[in-house]
Structures are given as C-alpha cells and as structure tokens.
Amino acid sequence: MSRMALVIAFVPALIGPASAQKAEIEAANAKWTEFYNKGDFAGMASLYTDDAIALPNGSAMVQGRAAIEAMWKGILAEHVGDPKLTTLDVKPLGPSAAREIGTFSLKTKGPRSQEVSGKYVVVWEKVGNNWKLATDIWNDGN
C-alpha cells in the first residue's frame, strides 16, 4: 500500500476520536458552568478526579476534590460570576486523557462589575464513561 493510501486510511480514524473528545469535553465544560451558575459547588467538584490539582492564578496550589470544592465555594464564587468558557483546542493524549486549551471570561460582583478574561489549560482523564478534570490551571490576561 502506498504512503498516500495509508494517510487516507488513517487520518479519518485519528480525527474522529479527537472531535469526539472535544465534543465530550465541551459538554463537561457546559455542565461545570451550569453548576457554577447554580452555586452547586459539590456538582462542580464532582467533575474533578479525586486527586485533581488546581493551580489558580496568583494563589497556592489546591489538591484533591474536597479542597477544590472549598476553593470554588469560598474564594472565587463570592467575587466573580457568569463564567464563559471557550475551548480553543483539544489534543488527545491517548484514549483516556486529553489536553484542553481555552479562554474564559467572568464578571466581578459588586457595584462596579467588570469583565475579567484569561486563558486556561486542563488535563482531562476519562473515568468510566465521564471526562474529569485532573489538572486545572488558569490565569488572567490575554
């Protein structure tokens, strides 16, 4: 078989799983946003692996699902709302892991509400049939 025939045969096989992963991860992001907007921090935490690590902008590393739930509940939820996540790229790291790069915007709460925007990187792990955040890092700015 020629090289071109091999490329034609295998490229669709590679694109299919990647686009499926992206769609599943975008659905998980939508669920995260839904939980956030409802103030359901336990629901948000359920989207992380048990041993997940969050690396918030300008703050100490947070490790473990319970600590991540407390982080969202105690620190950020009081100060920001209306999160919007935009997935820019999802790169499969095998059948049960993926790296996502995206941007976010939030609105600060209070009398002088401002929009804050930034970027993030998430490493996702497939746990059973669900994608879960294993590593979550973000910072503000473009």
Predicted regions mapped to residue ranges:
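A short, structured loop/turn motif at beta-sheet edges
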Residues: 90-98, 125-130
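Sec/Tat signal peptide C-region and signal peptidase I cleavage site
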Residues: 16-20
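Amphipathic alpha-helical repeat scaffolds
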Residues: 30-33
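A solvent-exposed, acidic/Ser-Thr-rich amphipathic alpha-helical stretch
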Residues: 22-28, 40-96, 105, 109, ...
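Short beta-strand edge/turn micro-motifs at domain boundaries
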Residues: 117-141
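Bacterial N-terminal signal peptides
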Residues: 5-14
